[in-house]
């Protein structure tokens, strides 16, 4: 236990609640979890929290596509996210949602504090507006032709083809990605956070060591280009929190999303009696706060977030740890290639500890992209974890169990060798602390090589066959198992499940301090397989399943596309003109109309078709009252063979259009058309 335990609050970026967790997300959560588990292993008090980012236009629109309320959708997504994180043994103390009472209260409090201190301004701006959906369009919901390279179907903020950035109003032939309509410009009052007022504070903070060198340098570029006021409001319709004191104005998702860190911690504090929210968030807090994020959201966490905290009277983070992107097999993750792999799909095929180890073996403290090469992944895990580390135990445990009733030697035979392993603790600890996980793994595997070299040289399988060598055999195997024990202790933050199985075998809870002394005269349990090597066939199956996931998702996307009359009811097969000519359609005047007793849908008509009266029954009662129709002109099929019905003879058919129910409209001719005229 640490003499003076640190009090640490750790967060991961909040996953957006409109899709599944994939292996790109998992990089960050594994990285943070390894660091958190290391801190706990050293006796520090750590609170590890996260939440779903559950607001914004994309969530509102996806819920509409799925035919459900946003609240229902984000609840279902949250369950899936939490199951995925649990599957990878991410040890959150609390997982919450930005759509919560705690977050609403805190977002309102932060906004009010900023407003009262003069950091909120308002002005009228012009934005693109979808006239069909009656909503303002975020940049990513406008598509058109790039003004620079003329590539079609580009988003409203930048071109994927040439990389140009621009305003959505610069697009050629812009269209709403929601409805396909041509957007119009419309004015609206918006609220802005006055970020430039915090420039001096931010310049000092970004150079204080609170950011990685690469991030700090990037901040200086943004300072040189000038800070701008930040639009923190959105107009209805919008799924989020209404701005206090305003009508149909909502907080932009990036205002309440980082406050979600506070909301999740507040939710945890309310569940426990031993946690004080203010101790961790007050301006003069002596606790530590760390955010793990991806490089795509640096701007928000390094400028807006610390400025909001400063303005509202809260503490700022000690550090923001930024990581790069994940590529697979040297390229961007691809759905068609099966390398866009969901966390759930991975868990159906492979052990989560394999990915945790591989990520650790490649992670460092810089903002480098990490490539998940699936062939290297298989080879490295099998070589390092199975052949070098776990095999060390299996090579020795059998002899200890069968020949010595599970008892290790009373004295340790190789104190100098053990000291070399134990003395690596401080070096490896520093690497974990500074997030140089790949270097820590290299140190551990180098020690594993030495341990295996010792066993190879001593050859216990040979000694076991020699008379009078029992003590030597017990000593060799006890050394091997003790070295294995040290290696697994060092791997405990990375591979918690392997550690649990090892602790059961060793009959001991592994602690960092415990590596200082070997186990002697200690009884271990019967050895069971601790880890299974990766079968390349399982990797291939995962890739194929990811292709199937992508295909299934495309089916859902197609199913969710906007529908229309031609989609819902396609045009029938072509007919010859002679077939059409057989249909005699005439203008008819509605002389009388009445409801049919005991009939839910039928109206009874008397129609004048130019000197001849016709009685017709029509199923449009749900759309019209009889009184609305009397005196109108309409179109009927006049040569339809009369049909005897329960309520009388129907001598034709009135033409109407629409999907049914209340949405039916009879056909009405222009003025001048007379009863009996033929419709050509």
Curated annotation (Swiss-Prot):
Protein name: Methionine--tRNA ligase
Cross-referenced HAMAP family: Met_tRNA_synth_type1 (MF_00098)
Main location (coarse class): cytoplasm
GO cellular component, one term: cytosol
Catalyzed reactions per annotation: tRNA(Met) + L-methionine + ATP = L-methionyl-tRNA(Met) + AMP + diphosphate
Pfam families membership: Anticodon_3, tRNA-synt_1g, tRNA_bind
Chain span(s) of sequence motif 'HIGH' region: 15-25
Keywords: Aminoacyl-tRNA synthetase, ATP-binding, Cytoplasm, Ligase, Metal-binding, Nucleotide-binding, Protein biosynthesis, RNA-binding, tRNA-binding, Zinc
